[in-house]
Regions:
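Glycine-rich phosphate-binding loop used to anchor ATP phosphates in small-molecule kinases
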Residues: 60-102, 110
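Conserved lysine of the Walker
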Residues: 21
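Small-molecule kinase domains that catalyze NTP-dependent phosphoryl transfer to phosphate-bearing small molecules
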Residues: 123-165
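The conserved Walker
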Residues: 17
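Conserved phosphate-donor/acceptor-positioning beta-strand/loop module used by diverse small-molecule
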Residues: 102-121, 153
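Hydrophobic anchor at the beta1->P-loop junction of P-loop NTPases
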Residues: 13
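Conserved substrate/cofactor phosphate-moiety recognition/catalytic segment
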Residues: 26-71
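Extreme N-terminal, non-catalytic leader segments
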Residues: 1-8
Length: 176
């Protein structure tokens, strides 16, 4: 766990496919009064088609998507909201791109093993991301250990526990 040195403006719930970004993001929103922004909704159709076909996205595929996510979070902040974005943010350069768009951005990294992620993806109904892409996600992952405004949590804990922990960490950054 890393403590926040300065106030966190918004959160990104990050990690590989199957780590629980959507359910944890919703729980953090519930515990913090924030607004969940589901990053997958902003993928262009071509990205969804590639992932559905088991083809990993390239940095180029993600570029416009990351720009759009940064704009959405910045807009939410301008409207006085407390945004919580779900986004894999696997590489440092992706996180830096989001940080450039949103000053004070914090990250909650849902850390888990490849085996657990694969099992979760294999048993997740109705999602476009196949379990076959988990290996490529771990290959691309640059864990954010030691990065500023980053909370690392064990993603095998209960959603309730993670949501409360992350919301408290966020609030603590705001009050000093």
């Amino acid at each position: 766990m890393t403590t926040a040195k300065t106030a966190i403006s918004a959160l990104v719930v990050m990690g590989v496919s199957g780590c629980g970004k959507s359910v944890v993001g919703a729980e953090i929103a519930l515990n913090s009064g924030g607004r969940l922004i589901e990053g997958d909704v902003f993928h262009p159709a071509a990205n969804i088609e590639k992932m559905s076909a088991g083809i990993p996205l390239t940095d180029e595929d993600r570029a416009g998507w990351l720009t759009r996510l940064g704009e959405e979070v910045a807009s939410a902040l301008e409207n006085g909201e407390r945004p919580i974005l779900t986004c894999s943010s696997l590489k440092l350069r992706y996180r830096e791109r989001l940080r450039e768009a949103v000053p004070g951005l914090g990250f909650v990294f849902l850390e888990l093993s490849k085996e657990v992620a694969t099992d979760r993806c294999a048993h997740r109904p109705g999602h476009f991301m196949p379990a076959s892409l988990v290996d490529s996600q771990f290959a691309a992952l640059e864990p954010p250990h030691g990065e500023p405004r980053t909370l690392v949590v064990d993603a095998t804990q209960s959603v309730d526990t993670i949501g409360k922990q992350a919301a408290a960490w966020w609030e603590e950054s705001r009050v000093g």
